[in-house]
Structures are given as structure tokens and as C-alpha cells.
């Protein structure tokens, strides 16, 4: 009799975006760093991402975060992010969900009040601040990746739409930033399908026209994200609010505004001279959920003004599950998956 192969999941969401935290069922991956382990998954074991983001187990609108042992002793755990577009090296919402999961799983014991710890992402170490009240994780603040404007106020002709003005920011991935009003959008939930169609056309046009290179990372692949920007409202001194929507290519409008989308907005506001260190931007999604981004400092790296920032949000645990992986099931594609499945009991990442 074949051993039953299972994967242990803790499903969470932040702002409506579901992050599936893989807590067990996967063998240790080769690689001396979390980044190297991510590259192994991407190149040799992409079946895990496909399994959990496609039917019958999942849908493309979800994300997956695989917990792995940290390779840096300062971190409590490592994590690898998987989305419909592939393997982003960082994500604010996924980091908030992963931080909540390691607290709920006891990998990092909860402490009342504020507590601090580190996680190791493919982009490197991430400082986490969690606020716990009566045993509940009420908020998580994580560092956003240093963010900058790569291209400002460019224009492209998009088939079926016309001329579209856009800027490009890097905040963990390259984002096209477009003004929603100029395209006729109020960023309400009933516009979701048309937002996805419009964003798909714009991203396809930009990808066909040009590529983008990070000033230290080099080529990080074609532009995968677009962020629709609503008008910014000044709520109080140093505090702004804006309706927003983030698109992930191909075809997904995120339920939340996303952490990296919020970081990209902070980079643009700094570039235009409209924000100072200590100022905050609350981005509000189609579903009226949101994140708060804080602009902390700015540094000059070559030709770029690089914005240091943090993202605050709340994650909820919505399910604990063991999924059974049966490679004889015609609906299940075990290519790029079977060799990393483990029949072991779930194990916590080493601390």
C-alpha cells in the first residue's frame, strides 16, 4: 500500500488576499540560502505552486508561503512566496500572513504587547513587529523593500484603450503605476472585471515594448504588477488615504491593496515631493480593506532616490488543513512535485 502523501496548511488572509502557509509535508530543499531554495523550487519543483494555486486545490487569486528553516541564525524561520506570476522575492501581505502564522503555530511564542523578531525572505532578513492583545495578533508591521521610481511619467499606446500614462516603481517587483480616474475608474468592487481586463492590456503592452533592470539585482524578469491609484485625501497632518487596486499578471486583481503596491505609492509620492519621512499612506481596496505604509527614510543609490518604508496590516487565520496528494488522480499533476513531497509528520522550521 502506498503511503498517503499530505501537505499541511494554515490558510490566512490579509485584506482579503488568502495566503496558504505550508507548515509541513515538504522535504528540506537544497540551497544555502532561502533565495537559493526559492530558485530550486522555481526551476526544479514548480509543481508545488501549481498544485496549491490551481483546481482542484486552489485558485490563482491565492498565494502560497512555504515555511523553511532559516539559513540566517538571526531569523525565526524562512519563507518562500509563490503567486500566479511566479516567485516574487518579497511581498508585504504574504509577510504579514507568514508572521501571523509563525506566532499562531508557536514557532515564535506569543508575548503580550509588542514583540519583535525576524523572518528570512528570498530578499533577505525582514524585521517584524507584532502587537498581541489577549493572545490575539492584532497587527503586524513589516519592513517594505527599499523602493524607488525607475521610470516617471512615460506613455504607451495600448490596443483597445489608447494612450496611457504610467510610471514604474520597484518595491519587491516592478509596478506600473497608473491613475485610475484618467481611465474612467472609481475603484469600486463592481469594476473589478474591467480593471483586470484593462490592466492585462496595459501590462501586455509594456512587456512587449520594454524591460526593466534593478540597479543591483539586474534583470528580474518582465514587469508583473500594475497598481491603479485613486485620488489621495489628506486625512490629517502627515496622513493620507487613497483607494487603490493591484493587478498581478496574468488576470488577477488582488483582494487587498498589497504591501508592495503601497510601498510603490510611497516611492512615487516621495519622487514628486509630496511626502516626508514619518508620513503615512493608507491604501484602501475595492473591498474597503487596507494597509498603512509609513515612509521612514530616503537614501540615494546611484541615480535613484530609494525609499525605506514599513507596512502595517492584520492577518486572520481561516483554516487548518491536511490536503491529500494522490498522483494517480487525473486532476493532479505531480510533475515537478513528487520528489519534494514527504510522508513525514509536519515539522516546524528550525529556530
From Swiss-Prot:
Superkingdom as given in the UniProt entry: Bacteria
InterPro entries: Pro_racemase_fam
GO molecular function: 4-hydroxyproline epimerase activity
General function of this protein: Displays neither proline racemase activity nor trans-4-hydroxy-L-proline (t4LHyp) epimerase activity nor t3LHyp dehydratase activity.
Family membership noted in the UniProt record: Belongs to the proline racemase family.
Protein name: Protein Maqu_2141
Species of the source: Marinobacter nauticus (strain ATCC 700491 / DSM 11845 / VT8) (Marinobacter aquaeolei)
Amino acid at each position: 500500500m502506498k503511503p498517503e502523501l499530505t501537505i499541511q496548511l494554515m490558510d490566512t488572509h490579509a485584506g482579503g488576499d488568502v495566503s496558504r502557509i505550508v507548515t509541513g509535508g515538504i522535504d528540506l530543499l537544497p540551497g544555502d540560502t532561502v533565495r537559493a531554495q526559492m530558485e530550486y523550487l522555481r526551476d526544479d519543483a514548480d509543481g508545488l505552486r501549481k498544485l496549491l494555486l490551481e483546481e482542484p486545490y486552489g485558485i490563482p487569486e491565492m498565494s502560497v508561503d512555504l515555511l523553511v528553516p532559516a539559513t540566517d541564525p538571526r531569523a525565526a524561520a524562512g519563507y518562500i512566496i509563490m503567486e500566479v506570476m511566479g516567485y516574487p522575492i518579497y511581498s508585504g501581505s504574504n509577510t504579514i500572513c507568514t508572521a501571523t502564522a509563525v506566532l499562531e503555530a508557536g514557532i515564535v511564542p506569543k508575548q503580550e504587547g509588542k514583540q519583535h523578531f525576524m523572518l528570512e525572505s528570498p530578499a533577505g532578513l525582514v524585521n517584524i513587529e507584532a502587537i498581541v492583545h489577549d493572545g490575539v495578533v492584532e497587527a503586524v508591521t513589516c519592513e517594505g523593500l527599499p523602493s524607488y521610481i525607475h521610470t516617471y511619467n512615460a506613455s504607451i499606446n495600448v490596443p483597445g484603450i489608447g494612450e496611457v500614462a504610467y510610471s514604474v516603481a520597484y518595491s519587491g517587483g516592478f509596478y506600473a503605476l497608473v491613475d485610475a480616474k484618467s481611465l474612467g475608474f472609481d475603484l469600486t468592487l463592481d469594476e473589478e472585471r474591467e480593471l483586470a481586463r484593462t490592466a492585462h492590456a496595459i501590462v501586455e503592452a509594456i512587456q512587449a515594448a520594454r524591460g526593466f533592470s534593478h540597479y543591483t539585482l539586474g534583470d528580474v524578469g518582465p514587469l508583473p504588477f500594475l497598481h491603479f491609484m485613486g485620488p489621495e485625501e489628506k486625512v490629517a497632518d502627515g496622513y493620507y488615504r487613497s483607494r487603490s487596486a493591484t493587478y498581478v499578471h496574468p488576470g488577477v486583481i488582488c483582494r487587498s491593496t498589497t504591501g508592495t503596491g503601497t510601498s510603490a505609492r510611497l516611492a512615487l509620492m516621495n519622487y514628486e515631493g509630496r511626502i516626508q519621512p514619518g508620513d503615512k499612506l493608507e491604501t484602501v481596496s475595492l473591498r474597503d480593506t487596507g494597509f498603512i505604509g509609513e515612509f521612514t527614510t530616503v537614501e540615494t543609490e546611484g541615480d535613484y532616490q530609494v525609499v525605506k518604508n514599513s507596512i502595517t496590516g492584520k492577518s486572520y487565520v481561516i483554516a487548518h488543513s491536511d490536503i491529500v496528494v494522490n498522483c494517480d488522480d487525473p486532476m493532479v499533476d505531480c510533475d515537478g512535485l513528487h520528489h519534494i513531497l514527504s510522508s513525514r509528520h509536519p515539522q516546524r522550521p528550525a529556530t
